[in-house]
């Protein structure tokens, strides 16, 4: 693979990681990290990050702006599809009944998947639509803060 391409992609990945982390999401990079968080009681929003255009243009901005709300999950975490493969695979084991999809969001409550917002519900939609989908999940499964 071309060295310039690798450098470019490393920069894209780093920017994508920084963007979601600065929004308040904890990076989970190992299967152990995933288990430690998702087995906890309460609600956890998992953002399955990606380098695709709909992740950067829609999903990550929605992940950030949806948090300007009174009803929120107990925890915000992210795994990076294609980068942190072990963590992503383990997270997907919790998403029973849903096909692998990135970018996407999964709301886990007490260690069990409640619902997902899959790529097809993100791609081709605008940021506000995805924010509304997230906040609908928050209203349904989370508590006011």
From Swiss-Prot:
Q: What parts of the sequence cross the membrane? A: none
Name assigned to this protein: Bacilliredoxin SAOUHSC_01610
GO biological process, alphabetically ordered: cell redox homeostasis
Q: Which Gene3D superfamilies match?
A: Glutaredoxin
Secretion signal span: none
Q: Which family does it belong to?
A: Belongs to the bacilliredoxin family.
Do you know which Pfam families this protein is assigned to?
Answer: Disulph_isomer (PF06491)
Annotated source species: Staphylococcus aureus (strain NCTC 8325 / PS 47)
């Amino acid at each position: 693979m071309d060295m310039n391409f690798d450098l470019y992609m490393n920069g894209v990945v780093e920017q994508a990681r920084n963007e979601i982390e600065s929004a308040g999401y904890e990076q989970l990079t190992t299967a152990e990290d995933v288990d430690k968080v998702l087995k906890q009681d309460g609600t956890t929003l998992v953002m399955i990050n990606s380098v695709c255009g709909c992740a950067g243009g829609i999903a990550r901005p929605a992940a950030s702006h949806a948090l300007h709300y009174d009803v929120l999950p107990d925890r915000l975490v992210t795994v990076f599809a294609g980068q942190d493969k072990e963590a992503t695979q383990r997270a997907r084991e919790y998403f029973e009944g849903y096909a692998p999809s990135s970018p996407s969001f999964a709301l886990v409550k007490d260690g069990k998947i409640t619902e997902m917002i899959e790529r097809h519900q993100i791609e081709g939609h605008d940021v506000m639509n995805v924010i509304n989908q997230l906040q609908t999940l928050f209203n349904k499964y989370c508590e006011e803060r």
